[in-house]
UniProtKB/Swiss-Prot annotation:
Belongs to the IspD/TarI cytidylyltransferase family. IspD subfamily. One of its GO terms (molecular function) is 2-C-methyl-D-erythritol 4-phosphate cytidylyltransferase activity. This is 2-C-methyl-D-erythritol 4-phosphate cytidylyltransferase. PROSITE patterns: ISPD. The record marks 17, 24 as: Transition state stabilizer. It comes from Chlamydia felis (strain Fe/C-56). Pfam families: IspD (PF01128).
């Protein structure tokens, strides 16, 4: 049986690249704020028994009627995750971006199983494009690369220790499993089985509608 997990749902981003008059995670999508699609899916996952929404207090009303905890958003992603960790009571935690509307229960269950083998795991997909490094220009082997998605599953104490180390060493993390990497803990990669999208630009909403 999989252990119970907490979910940190990150909703503190400003969404400057999107160009809307409000953060993109709160834009209407299929009749409700975008982030609620992820939240409603999370509620269907039996392993999740605690949800912490990290957001600006002015947006807490959007989650009225949901049994969630709130934590204030930080300046950086890792600051927001650290803020959410203060409310986590489970030994395992999932972290998910609020601008990713799709969470699939079967993938999350597999992710939790795999994470227990090493201490950390993330969803990934293959790179379908040719990727070139800049300065100097060099073609990279795309078979050795992966596109990283969320949610990511990490042992709570590992995530906390890694974030504290990053803070001491003044390292900016680009994803949450990097906290495990800093500690020398291997990260397991779990291939996603369903379409994933992160809403970054207006055209991404069109793609998300098509994926429903």
């Amino acid at each position: 049986m999989n252990p119970k997990c907490s979910l940190i749902l990150l909703s503190g981003g400003k969404g400057e690249r999107f160009g809307a008059n409000q953060p993109k995670q709160y834009l209407p999508f299929q009749g409700q704020p975008l982030i609620l699609h992820a939240l409603n899916s999370a509620l269907l996952i039996p392993e999740i028994n605690e949800i912490i929404v990290v957001c600006d207090a002015s947006y807490e009303h959007i989650f009225e009627g949901y049994s969630v905890k709130f934590a204030p958003a930080g300046m950086r992603r890792q600051d927001s995750v650290f803020s959410g960790l203060h409310h986590v009571t489970n030994p395992w935690v999932l972290v998910h971006d609020g601008v990713r509307p799709f969470i699939y229960p079967d993938e999350v269950s597999e992710l939790i199983v795999i994470a227990q083998q090493t201490g950390a795991a993330t969803l990934v997909s293959n790179v379908p494009y040719t990727i070139k490094q800049r300065n100097p220009v060099k073609t990279l082997d795309r078979d050795s690369l992966s596109i990283v998605h969320t949610p990511q599953c990490i042992k709570t104490e590992i995530l906390l220790e890694g974030l504290e180390l990053a803070d001491r060493e003044q390292i900016t993390l680009v994803d949450d499993t990097q906290a495990a990497e800093l500690l020398g803990i291997p990260v397991s990669l779990v291939s996603n089985k369903h379409p994933q999208i992160k809403i970054t630009y207006p055209e991404d909403l069109t793609i998300a509608h098509a994926l429903l």
